[in-house]
Amino acid sequence: MAIQHKKGGGHRGRGSKTGRSRGRKFETSRLKDVREDESSGEEEDVDVQPAEDMNDSEGTDVSSESGLDEPPKENSYSTLLKLLNTDAKSNEPARKKRKIKANEPDANLVEVSIPTADDIEQMDEVADTEASASEDENMDDEGLPGEDYAEDIGTDGRNDMFELHFGNPDETELSQKIQACSKAWKSTKADLIDGLYSVVSMPDVEGNSSAIPEACWSVRLLTYRQLKQKLARNTVSFDRLNSCLTPYIFGYHDTFFCSRTTQNSAKLRDLYCLHALNHVLKTRDRVIKNSAILSREDNGDVELRDQGFTRPKVLIILPTRQACVRVINSFTKIYPMEQQENKKRFMDSFSAADSDEWAHKPDDFKELFGGNDDDMFRLGLKFTRKSLKFFSKFYSSDIILASPLGLRTAIEKEGGKKNENDFLSSIEMVIVDHADALIMQNWDHVEYIFSNLNLQPKEAHGCDFSRVRQWYLDGHGKFLRQTLVFSAFNTPELNALYNTQMQNVFGKAKIMSKYEGAMLNLRLPISVKQTFSRFDSASPLKDPEARFQYFTRTVLASLARGWTESSSRKKSGGTLIFIPSYLDFVRVRNHFANSSQTENISFGLISEYTSVRDSSRARSHFMNGRHSVLLYTERAHHFRRYNIRGVTNIVMYGLPDNPIFWGDLIEYLGSAAGGTATPTVRVLFSKWDALKLERIAGTARVRSMLLEKGGDTFTFV
């Protein structure tokens, strides 16, 4: 199957060159006749193009043998429980509880228990005592774990979510949960911190609680519940956000976090990198420990199932090569390695310096496109006791990092006769970071990758089936896989992923924000009239047609009355028509080119496929008055962030997904503040735009705007 690549490595948002076509020439723009020189106001932008070629995941494989690191000798978590129980029996005041209420009554709203300062101090004292023990004391002469390793995997395994989830899940309970996944899930909602709230869902099985996990307020407490000690040595301290997310992530819940920002992205990255490393090291230690046990057994009666079909366990999906570099930096910060093979090759092909020409760009743009913004890559990482190998073969890798396009090209082979997806058959953790950016690339690639996860392999690849976990053999790998998705906002595509692909039997959590509304945070020297017009739409499939009919019959008809052949720019002003979808953009463009309704309107256009030169010319003509109307797509703004001048009116054919874009577009009106025309904004929306509308108008207003029966027009000044 041919790949529809909407966004490629070195040409962000560009389209292919067009040749001459037969018959009537298609009219893509219309200019007013003026005497000024055509190039007088033209603006040229320079688009930085990454020239790095894709590096495949090929490389020389090395031995998979690795050493072990040993946990402390004593059962520290039991000691901690005894300490807390002793405190509860004392005469000291009981732990404080704070009930957090939502704006509206909710029967499922729960109480969140916040540890006091004394509680946290006591936890840390216990942790400090245990942290002084050396892991090497529990290693035997061969570098294998000593008898005290049983603490991690044996007697206290009930306290370790890794063991409960992947080690020894109850087969009867697991079967009941898998059957319940196809039915309705029960959910619990609760407020968290800083305007965040969570919805935790669990398969509806008797005795299966959907209670909100208690926050982990101490990294040391996490260490002795879930974390390998060697990772805790370099772990950053927890802030309030990490404390709230840790129980979901380290509890192996599927987690969809919808409030990623440039301020919290680094800490989120450190958190999921810590979790991924912890999972890989625990998996490796269990396999080597069991191999040592089997080597000492004379008979074959011992059955130890601790593996999948193939070695890769963690898949991290990222938008750019530079994002991959940041993840690697987090890995090496948390888990410093004595040897890093092929590190120079990795840095040469993945890392690049930021462009000085983007100094004026917003922070979210620089975070996404700074450095090497190539979106065609894939990389295998292999961990041993003392080394990290870059560019390892996928079947020898522990962690795979890739862009959606890069991984899809690895799965698909020429001719499409056979897909190479066996290396994804035993993935136990999928991390999708900056998911909102992946939507702007090509979300079809992400959906394709998820459709190829946890399938039965077509070849053995040297697998020892006597050690493959039973639920892998039964084809239930997807029900125990943990999926973590981090996005700046929620979209229908991400909701569909959450509902269809995140089927973890241990539950899932969606963490969202309450929005004040982007329309309230404008930085303009003048007041702007913002009018929201609601139109009726029977279904999402019929929404594009209903939107187009409303636009042409109502909005465009009223605007066209001011656009005549003799009308001046001062009277009508420059109108920017913002169109989120490229398919809608093509339809509106064709209408402007061929309809008698717009035959007297001079217009230009900028889409993600418009070249930099043509975009600069269109902006220049619009600023100088040769274009009365400029058609502009959301993906063009996402990839270019143009500063468009001469805008006095804005018509939004649809709301932008990214609320940051609302402020960018409205601030265009500030460049024309000295004109005689009064700036206006007209927005079209339907009930299917609820997620977008909430981010723009605010959580408190969205319900009334969608359900109000007294009128379909809402004006804000």
Curated annotation (Swiss-Prot):
<dbReference type="GO" id="GO:0032040">
    <property type="term" value="C:small-subunit processome"/>
</dbReference>
<feature type="region of interest" description="Disordered">
    <location>
        <begin position="1"/>
        <end position="147"/>
    </location>
</feature>
<feature type="compositionally biased region" description="Basic residues">
    <location>
        <begin position="1"/>
        <end position="23"/>
    </location>
</feature>
<feature type="compositionally biased region" description="Acidic residues">
    <location>
        <begin position="118"/>
        <end position="147"/>
    </location>
</feature>
<dbReference type="Pfam" id="PF22916">
    <property type="entry name" value="UTP25_NTPase-like"/>
</dbReference>
<dbReference type="GO" id="GO:0034511">
    <property type="term" value="F:U3 snoRNA binding"/>
</dbReference>
<dbReference type="InterPro" id="IPR053940">
    <property type="entry name" value="UTP25_NTPase-like"/>
</dbReference>
<keyword id="KW-0690">Ribosome biogenesis</keyword>
<dbReference type="InterPro" id="IPR053939">
    <property type="entry name" value="UTP25_C"/>
</dbReference>
<dbReference type="GO" id="GO:0000462">
    <property type="term" value="P:maturation of SSU-rRNA from tricistronic rRNA transcript (SSU-rRNA, 5.8S rRNA, LSU-rRNA)"/>
</dbReference>
<dbReference type="GO" id="GO:0019843">
    <property type="term" value="F:rRNA binding"/>
</dbReference>
<keyword id="KW-0687">Ribonucleoprotein</keyword>
<dbReference type="InterPro" id="IPR010678">
    <property type="entry name" value="UTP25"/>
</dbReference>
<comment type="function">
    <text>DEAD-box RNA helicase-like protein required for pre-18S rRNA processing, specifically at sites A0, A1, and A2.</text>
</comment>
<dbReference type="InterPro" id="IPR027417">
    <property type="entry name" value="P-loop_NTPase"/>
</dbReference>
<comment type="similarity">
    <text>Belongs to the UTP25 family.</text>
</comment>
<protein>
    <recommendedName>
        <fullName>U3 small nucleolar RNA-associated protein 25</fullName>
    </recommendedName>
</protein>
<comment type="subunit">
    <text>Component of the ribosomal small subunit (SSU) processome composed of at least 40 protein subunits and snoRNA U3.</text>
</comment>
<feature type="compositionally biased region" description="Basic and acidic residues">
    <location>
        <begin position="24"/>
        <end position="38"/>
    </location>
</feature>
<dbReference type="Pfam" id="PF06862">
    <property type="entry name" value="Utp25_C"/>
</dbReference>
<keyword id="KW-0539">Nucleus</keyword>
<keyword id="KW-0698">rRNA processing</keyword>
<dbReference type="GO" id="GO:0005730">
    <property type="term" value="C:nucleolus"/>
</dbReference>
